[in-house]
Amino acid sequence: MAKRPLQTEANVERLPSELKRRKKKNSLKVTPGTVIGQNSKSRRNVPGMDDGNDKRASDSRYLPTPELSALPQSTIDEYLSSNSIHIADPSTDPSLRPITSFSFLPESSNDLYLPLEKFSSPTPIQAVSWPLAFAGRDLIGVAETGSGKTLAFGLPCLRRVLELNNSETSCKPCALIITPTRELAVQIYDQLLRFSSAVDVGIACIYGGSPKDHQRREIRNASVVIATPGRLKDFQADQTINLSGVKYLVLDEADRMLDKGFEQDIQDIVKGIPSTQKRQTIMFTATWPIGVRNLAASFTKNPVTVTIGDSSDIRANKRIKQMVEVLQPYEKDSRLLELLRRYQDGGKNNHRILVFCLYKKEAMRVERFIGSKGFKVAGIHGDMSQTERFRSLEAFKSGSISLLVATDVAARGLDIPAVKLVLNVTFPLTIEDYVHRIGRTGRAGAEGLAITLFTERDKALSGPLINVLRAADQDVPESLLKFGATVKKKQHESYGAFFREMDTTKVASRIKFED
């Protein structure tokens, strides 16, 4: 079976008319806690989900369509294999029936699915996540950026809100989505607004750097709140928001939130939310380090872990062609101009170039330098106001500006369509940030190009970079190999190289002593 296409507007097929007709009243009559496995022709209950004390179980309704149930198991297995999908489920048989077509979505008595018309088929992370999330299971998704994670958690979120009765929705919000940056929060809001407006579900977006009064008004009638940790904590502290009614919690970009030091903030926020017995928790992350595993263990109950690809090491999207040029620092400006002139094509919408710098001052200098050479360019970095940053992003997305100079503030989560080239003027501080930077291109099944200007100052990261290139089947230049392919062991800030990371989620082995 060929690999399923990703969501793109280039390979559009209209939704089947059968899906559009799904507006039957009371069509969600199904048994809670259902996951579909091998040889399943009907629903089966998930162990642990029908606990009488688990109030969320009675709210979770999912039954696969007859068409999905009728698919041969060999077809399902081939889909999982061809898309490198791995499932780890502590409660049940890990096999399942992914929703590989929009026509396999569970019936709905409203217009929730209509905005899907512009897409051809679910992405792999959506196909596998939806049946689990619809069934009320806690879920951890590990997938590359640009894989369609927003709808993977967003569609079940809205469907869950619609399933709740009036008494359960009276305490708002019913669903909370936490994300590390305001740009990503706004992006999630924009994507979900198309679906929520079709079914009259109120959503709000709260983040720092914007007036609080307006956001306070927005969240009063919002069933779904999308928030950054800092502003959410502020609103909790002044009792603007009450999270005691949250039944659906999403932690998006969990690894990035840990990188930015938000772990304690998240711990504090979750204290005001119902326990795992009464809520469903979804986590998405691009990487799966020990810290994220420990966070997942403390916030979820018997979660299913879905991994797209190999999460053991950080890996770059193989659809992105990576080129590394080793040069002297003083050669960067002239080489930058050569590359821009080669790949810039009249500012067309499909020729956007994203230029990354490490520091704010450098980004401002590079932006001025590029602008002085006649290019239309905008910038985004930490010294800019919220309004200025959004203005730059919107200009870049719309195509009125085809060059954007950014620091790593824009490197994660932002879905900017049709970025032709990512150009790293300076190498980031970590190999993870490198992978996240270049992930701005090659999104949603498209091909991409990333060019990195590498100097001797960056040689400490030559080993990890070489590993990423090789893992993605990319050419490794000899000039890079001369710096060495050794990967240095990460050091703890207090204990140095003697520190050993431990996976605290593992159960200790039982030792039996003879009498």
UniProtKB/Swiss-Prot annotation:
InterPro entries: DEAD/DEAH_box_helicase_dom, Helicase_ATP-bd, Helicase_C-like, P-loop_NTPase, RNA-helicase_DEAD-box_CS. CDD domains: DEADc, SF2_C_DEAD. ATP binds at residues 143-150. GO terms for biological process: rRNA processing. Residues 130-306 form the Helicase ATP-binding domain. The Q motif is unique to and characteristic of the DEAD box family of RNA helicases and controls ATP binding and hydrolysis. Belongs to the DEAD box helicase family. DDX5/DBP2 subfamily. This is ATP-dependent RNA helicase DBP3.
